[in-house]
Design a protein with these regions (language model features):
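Active-site-adjacent structural elements in enzyme catalytic cores
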Residues: 1-153
Length: 153
């Protein structure tokens, strides 16, 4: 994929045809713009170089962790699931609910770990996101596709 490639993901056929290509691009360190159920987002795989490029692209002067898009709780071992978090996930996932859970293992990159060792996760129901997550087999980071202080994209 070139530096600026647009891949159609509107239909089920598009997603089936292109999800593996997007997953390879992410594994190779690429950044992607993607739809979610709320706004457009920017994301990457959990690797040092693309995470640093994503932070620069967002012009983040101070460390602010990126959230993780997941298919479900099974995608993120190493988080402390409280009873309340489990109830919320069962009730509202997939959907626009972000849970902030304490990391119990140090296997998360610093770019996704917040104050107190927490990680924000969301199970997006958007078919494009799900197709990529299924193909990639791991979470991706996500942040809104706008600069700080600007309206969401």
């Amino acid at each position: 994929m070139s530096a600026h490639t647009s891949i159609p993901f509107r239909t089920a056929e598009d997603r089936e045809r292109h999800a593996s290509r997007v997953a390879v691009y992410l594994r190779d360190g690429g950044l992607v713009a993607h739809p979610t159920e709320t706004v457009y987002g920017l994301g990457c795989a959990l690797r040092a170089d693309p995470l640093a490029r994503l932070a620069r692209l967002k012009r983040r002067g101070t460390p602010r962790p990126f959230l993780l898009l997941v298919r479900g709780a099974q995608d993120v071992p190493g988080l402390e699931w409280t009873e309340a978090a489990e109830r919320l996930a069962r009730a509202f996932w997939p959907g626009p609910l972000t849970l902030v859970l304490r990391a119990t293992q140090g296997n998360f990159p610093p770019e996704v770990v917040g104050e107190g060792g927490t990680v924000a996760i969301r199970a997006s129901p958007h078919p494009a996101v799900l197709a990529v997550l299924d193909e990639l087999g791991e979470p991706i980071t996500s942040t809104s596709a706008n600069l700080p202080g600007e309206p969401p994209a």
